[in-house]
Amino acid sequence: VAEMSRMAHAAGKQIICYKLGKSELGKELAKSHTGAIAGNDDAFNAFINYHGIARVEIFETLIEIPNLFKNKKRSKSKRVGIVTTTGGGGAMVVESLSGSDIEIIDSGLSIKKIMQDNNIAFNNNKLVDLTIAGTKPEIVNEVISQMMKNENCDLVVMVVGSSAKFRPEQAVEPLLKWANDPKPLAVYVAPDAPEALNLLHQNNVDKKTALEYV
């Protein structure tokens, strides 16, 4: 695996793995398979982190995650900026990421000024909640632009609420311009919004259809 990892990175390719064995029962079941990597899960995580291998927790994520790495330079840091149009959906993402070895960054004074200039309440530095008032293409563009330029942020997560289903032009279409940006942008669509998801997929923007994939 280590040699494969070195060859893949030399060729500019990312390795993504899914592994059983987080639970004691899972470890026992995994041992029965030929070629299984047995042993302590913490040791395995240390091994793949050292070799730059990304691990996913849900099998279906193997299908959704490649766009997050496509043409992106992987950072050793884990600093994430989160923007949302829906407070509930944004809080769910923050909760999900808080259980990982991830630092959710402060949004900074520039974004605070954008919010104040547009009369949008700014209550939490860790979660930029645009609310309905800020779900406008020009505001989304301005806020995400600041996040993407922030040198203290390695990845940006945008959470889009019901506007993704009924008005994708407000908060989904403005995100397409960053599809090929060196900094990864992941979009979590809170409601069922197939047209918005298809739009993101067609433009190679990393989309998440379940909270656990974020």
Named regions from a protein language model:
Residues 3-9, 48:
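Tubulin/FtsZ superfamily GTPase core signature
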Residues 1, 54-58, 134, 162-166:
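Short, glycine-rich nucleotide/cofactor-binding loops
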